[in-house]
């Protein structure tokens, strides 16, 4: 009976901490990181005071279709894209500080062009040329404050905000735009009513 109680407590604690939608967890990341260089990237985050804005094992997740595409589950963005990493993480930190984006899980970030194509990503995707994150919110979370922020401050941040039919939300700082399920601005959950 004690093990059932412990299991229920652990499950409850996991549920309270946010979303857990991806098998690429801390253990899988630690195994991967043992064979891949991440020190310079981590140091860049520390120097920019952005380390921990997103857990590193989530921040380095490649496409969710990594298995299907026979790619790596994690990837470090090229150094030329690190300024975009910093700006996107600064945006996420601001959204957190304003109470707009408190609980979330990053399920996809940098992707190399080959993996992006295999995973069905857009040609010229911010995931490949700048830095973007796709994230999931808990079922109870209201995504509309993201739209209000985008409408009021998105242009200043050069913020891209999209939502896919799966419920995933895309964030980047690679251009002021929004889109929805069909890829157009008109289908965006942030489109202002006419």
Q: What name fits each language-model region?
A:
Residues 1-4:
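Positively charged n-region of N-terminal signal peptides that target proteins for export
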Residues 7-15:
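Bacterial N-terminal signal peptides
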Residues 12-13, 60-61, 181-183:
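Secretory-pathway extracellular proteins and peptide precursors enriched for disulfide-bonded cysteines
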Residues 17-89, 188-194:
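Extracytoplasmic cell-surface/polysaccharide-interacting catalytic and binding patches
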Residues 48, 92-99, 139, 154:
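Sec/Tat-exported extracytoplasmic proteins
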Residues 84-91, 100, 142-149:
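Stable alpha-helical elements in mature extracytoplasmic
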Residues 89-120:
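Extended, low-complexity, intrinsically disordered C-terminal regulatory tails
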């Amino acid at each position: 009976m004690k093990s059932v109680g412990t299991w229920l407590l652990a499950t409850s604690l996991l549920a309270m901490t946010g979303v857990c939608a991806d098998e690429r967890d801390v253990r899988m990341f630690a195994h991967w990181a043992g064979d891949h260089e991440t020190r310079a990237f981590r140091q860049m985050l520390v120097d920019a005071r952005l380390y921990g804005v997103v857990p590193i094992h989530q921040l380095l997740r490649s496409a969710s279709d990594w298995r299907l595409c026979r790619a790596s589950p994690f990837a470090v963005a090229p150094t030329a894209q690190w300024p975009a990493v910093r700006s996107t993480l600064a945006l996420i930190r601001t959204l957190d500080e304003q109470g707009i984006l408190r609980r979330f899980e990053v399920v996809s970030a940098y992707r190399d062009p080959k993996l992006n194509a295999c995973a069905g990503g857009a040609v010229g995707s911010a995931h490949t040329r700048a830095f973007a994150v796709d994230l999931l919110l808990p079922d109870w979370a209201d995504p509309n404050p993201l739209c209000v922020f985008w409408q009021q401050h998105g242009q200043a941040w050069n913020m891209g905000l999209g939502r896919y039919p799966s419920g995933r939300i895309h964030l980047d700082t690679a251009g002021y735009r929004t889109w929805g399920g069909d890829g157009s601005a008109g289908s965006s959950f942030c489109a202002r009513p006419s």
